[in-house]
């Protein structure tokens, strides 16, 4: 079988489980053959050998079981860069790029800015921020040692030196350190949310946060005052139906200038507020 026929066959198979079957099929073939996408188009008639076909069949089997492409290939693009991922980390999503966009609007690239990320996972957010803000000092926390190993691997890949990765249950290991900005894409899915059925390959602890999905966010907002400088800003990603609850939690904890930002689909996705004594 040549590459062109393989793409067509896989596209038809994957159509049953994916809304982007052509893209998925190309990525799997690129992975099995260890080639670029341009190679697929310039070598359509190139035959796939037996060893490559066996690997491709194995990859296809995983995709047909609804395993995300990112876990199959072990990598995912975020903020125009490639990051390693594993089943110990969440897959970075485009919505989370809002955190970077809004943070960059609030910072001065020439100043030394201290930034804290809570729940860094594969490190995509902190590393992307560190690359954009060369003078920043970023601290990235996660409770998962396995996730931090992936984050450190990504830091090495992108030659990052201004991110400090720390194993910590939220703020626990920070002592009295304070930051100009705190940001997080925390767990915010409800315990029995039906959407979890489609996320069964991803780490549950990084997704679910209590019956209403707000346990982690409550903790983050209530305790941020001990680790943020006066006038500092806290930015939190959340579910599209959680805006009112997030505003209530911020107000209960006396935060100022509470603002919600919508994602590209027009859903409330990020809320930020300023701490002022």
Where are these regions (language model features)?
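Conserved hydrophobic residues forming the short capping helix/wall of the S-adenosyl-L-methionine
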Residues: 14, 107, 155, 224, ...
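Residue-level signal for inorganic ion chemistry
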Residues: 28, 66, 96, 125, ...
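Conserved AdoMet
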Residues: 31-105
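Conserved SAM/SAH cofactor-binding pocket of Class I
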Residues: 95-195
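Conserved SAM-binding loop
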Residues: 140, 209, 235
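Mobile active-site "lid"/loop adjacent to the S-adenosyl-L-methionine
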Residues: 186-216
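Conserved Class I SAM-dependent methyltransferase catalytic core
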Residues: 212-274
């Amino acid at each position: 079988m040549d590459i062109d026929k393989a793409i067509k066959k896989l596209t038809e198979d994957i159509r049953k489980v994916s809304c982007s079957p052509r893209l998925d099929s190309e990525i799997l073939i690129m992975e099995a053959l260890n080639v670029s996408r341009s190679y697929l188009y310039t070598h359509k008639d190139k035959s796939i050998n037996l060893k490559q076909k066996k690997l491709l069949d194995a990859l296809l089997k995983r995709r047909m079981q609804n395993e995300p492409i990112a876990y199959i290939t072990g990598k995912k693009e975020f903020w125009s860069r490639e990051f390693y991922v594993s089943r110990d980390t969440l897959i970075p999503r485009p919505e989370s790029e809002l955190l970077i966009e809004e943070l960059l609007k609030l910072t001065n690239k020439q100043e030394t800015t201290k930034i804290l990320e809570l729940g860094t996972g594969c490190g995509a957010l902190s590393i992307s921020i560190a690359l954009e803000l060369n003078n920043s000092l970023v601290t990235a926390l996660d409770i998962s040692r396995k996730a931090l190993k992936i984050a450190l691997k990504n830091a090495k890949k992108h030659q990052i030196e201004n991110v400090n990765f720390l194993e910590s249950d939220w703020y626990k290991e920070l002592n009295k350190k304070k930051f100009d900005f705190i940001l997080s894409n925390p767990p915010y899915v409800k315990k029995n949310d039906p959407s979890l059925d489609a996320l069964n390959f991803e780490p549950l602890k990084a997704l679910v946060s209590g019956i209403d999905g707000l346990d982690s966010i409550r903790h983050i907002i209530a305790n941020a005052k001990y680790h943020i400088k006066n006038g500092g800003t806290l930015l939190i990603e959340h579910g599209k139906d959680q805006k009112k609850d997030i505003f209530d939690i911020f107000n209960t904890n006396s935060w100022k200038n509470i603002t919600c930002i919508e994602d590209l689909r027009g859903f409330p996705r990020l809320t930020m507020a300023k701490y002022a004594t």
